[in-house]
Amino acid sequence: MSGIIATYLIHDDSHNLEKKAEQIALGLTIGSWTHLPHLLQEQLKQHKGNVIHVEELAEHEHTNSYLRKKVKRGIIKIEYPLLNFSPDLPAILTTTFGKLSLDGEVKLIDLTFSDELKKHFPGPKFGIDGIRNLLQVHDRPLLMSIFKGMIGRNIGYLKTQLRDQAIGGVDIVKDDEILFENALTPLTKRIVSGKEVLQSVYETYGHKTLYAVNVTGRTFDLKENAKRAVQAGADILLFNVFAYGLDVLQSLAEDDEIPVPIMAHPAVSGAYSASKLYGISSPLLLGKLLRYAGADFSLFPSPYGSVALEKEEALAISKYLTEDDVFFKKSFSVPSAGIHPGFVPFIIRDFGKDVVINAGGGIHGHPNGAQGGGKAFRTAIDATLQNKPLHEVDDINLHSALQIWGNPSHEVKL
């Protein structure tokens, strides 16, 4: 294979999956085939999309009800020649799912890149090992928290929040994705003030915390804004990838003047991936493509919290982010939304130690504030790695957290 193989879930009311697959393969490449003169067929053969797999799935009543017609469901795979497109994500996505995405009854499940094609993508600049080296933390999951309620607040409020989270043992603190450039907490001021706070905490407590600052603005201003952030001392860039595009992420990741990790936020991605019947699958969008394009971290809804993905999907995202690939470093999985200390054993059981445990309200909502919330999570992480049930741990911060949010993991075994 020298090109790319696209895997689709299709729904066909004509009940002929093979014909539907061939129509897609032709429609996204040379347009027609059977009516072409033999000589022209020979000339265009190398550009033709080829159906390489058709698999019928069981009938699904919910799907029929939603589509208001009886359809045949199937998985098909089509190989697209590398000759047909330039080796970039806009060309790849347009080739494999451009006008087909308007069908409304087709879901792009996966894209399998040839080795030749993979060479054109940067992958994570730091990856899991590089991030761990920055923090000098190698034996446990990382803990991340989020600034909460920052809109309309000043730098003093940010510094207080940041200090409390760092003292609580949080490894990474990230901006809220809806915190943009503003007069009260402008980008460079956030970074400079944040570094002062984190250096003070490190000198006093010996704990290192990194700050992920949200890089925003118009698309053609992003590189300049990212470089300003780097010059001001940014540790990590948070980026709302799907508000801009995967190719924009790749452009930032490939720039040698932006030598910091990039954290991909999934904002807007639900518009592409939420439906089970059409769009682009979450594992492909939030896993494989983000990793290929250069994300060191990928945030996605956890299977446990307030905006839950199905467990199978969440684990598939993580698999794409962390599976061995000679071309790419591994990206950190960051299952998010509604996470509290009682979920820690689930997260470690399902995602392993190479995961970032990300919490907002589960840290800030603690009775002892963000310091207590961070300490509760760190205690839960340590206890889980020792295979000790959380309810048996004698720690006031963890006990308070379990009292508030519960302990659904009391029977979890690693």
Swiss-Prot record:
<feature type="binding site">
    <location>
        <position position="338"/>
    </location>
    <ligand>
        <name>substrate</name>
    </ligand>
</feature>
<comment type="subunit">
    <text>Homodimer.</text>
</comment>
<feature type="binding site">
    <location>
        <begin position="174"/>
        <end position="177"/>
    </location>
    <ligand>
        <name>substrate</name>
    </ligand>
</feature>
<comment type="pathway">
    <text>Amino-acid biosynthesis; L-methionine biosynthesis via salvage pathway; L-methionine from S-methyl-5-thio-alpha-D-ribose 1-phosphate: step 3/6.</text>
</comment>
<protein>
    <recommendedName>
        <fullName>2,3-diketo-5-methylthiopentyl-1-phosphate enolase</fullName>
        <ecNumber>5.3.2.5</ecNumber>
    </recommendedName>
</protein>
<dbReference type="GO" id="GO:0019509">
    <property type="term" value="P:L-methionine salvage from methylthioadenosine"/>
</dbReference>
<feature type="binding site" description="via carbamate group">
    <location>
        <position position="174"/>
    </location>
    <ligand>
        <name>Mg(2+)</name>
    </ligand>
</feature>
<feature type="binding site">
    <location>
        <position position="148"/>
    </location>
    <ligand>
        <name>substrate</name>
    </ligand>
</feature>
<dbReference type="InterPro" id="IPR000685">
    <property type="entry name" value="RuBisCO_lsu_C"/>
</dbReference>
<dbReference type="InterPro" id="IPR017443">
    <property type="entry name" value="RuBisCO_lsu_fd_N"/>
</dbReference>
<feature type="binding site">
    <location>
        <position position="177"/>
    </location>
    <ligand>
        <name>Mg(2+)</name>
    </ligand>
</feature>
<keyword id="KW-0479">Metal-binding</keyword>
<dbReference type="GO" id="GO:0016984">
    <property type="term" value="F:ribulose-bisphosphate carboxylase activity"/>
</dbReference>
<dbReference type="InterPro" id="IPR036376">
    <property type="entry name" value="RuBisCO_lsu_C_sf"/>
</dbReference>
<dbReference type="Pfam" id="PF02788">
    <property type="entry name" value="RuBisCO_large_N"/>
</dbReference>
<feature type="modified residue" description="N6-carboxylysine">
    <location>
        <position position="174"/>
    </location>
</feature>
<dbReference type="InterPro" id="IPR036422">
    <property type="entry name" value="RuBisCO_lsu_N_sf"/>
</dbReference>
<feature type="active site" description="Proton acceptor">
    <location>
        <position position="99"/>
    </location>
</feature>
<dbReference type="GO" id="GO:0000287">
    <property type="term" value="F:magnesium ion binding"/>
</dbReference>
<dbReference type="Pfam" id="PF00016">
    <property type="entry name" value="RuBisCO_large"/>
</dbReference>
<keyword id="KW-0028">Amino-acid biosynthesis</keyword>
<dbReference type="GO" id="GO:0015977">
    <property type="term" value="P:carbon fixation"/>
</dbReference>
<feature type="binding site">
    <location>
        <begin position="360"/>
        <end position="361"/>
    </location>
    <ligand>
        <name>substrate</name>
    </ligand>
</feature>
<feature type="binding site">
    <location>
        <position position="176"/>
    </location>
    <ligand>
        <name>Mg(2+)</name>
    </ligand>
</feature>
<keyword id="KW-0460">Magnesium</keyword>
<dbReference type="GO" id="GO:0043715">
    <property type="term" value="F:2,3-diketo-5-methylthiopentyl-1-phosphate enolase activity"/>
</dbReference>
<dbReference type="InterPro" id="IPR017717">
    <property type="entry name" value="Diketo-Methiopentyl-P_enolase"/>
</dbReference>
<comment type="function">
    <text>Catalyzes the enolization of 2,3-diketo-5-methylthiopentyl-1-phosphate (DK-MTP-1-P) into 2-hydroxy-3-keto-5-methylthiopentenyl-1-phosphate (HK-MTPenyl-1-P).</text>
</comment>
<dbReference type="InterPro" id="IPR033966">
    <property type="entry name" value="RuBisCO"/>
</dbReference>
<feature type="binding site">
    <location>
        <position position="265"/>
    </location>
    <ligand>
        <name>substrate</name>
    </ligand>
</feature>
<keyword id="KW-0413">Isomerase</keyword>
<keyword id="KW-0486">Methionine biosynthesis</keyword>
<comment type="similarity">
    <text>Belongs to the RuBisCO large chain family. Type IV subfamily.</text>
</comment>
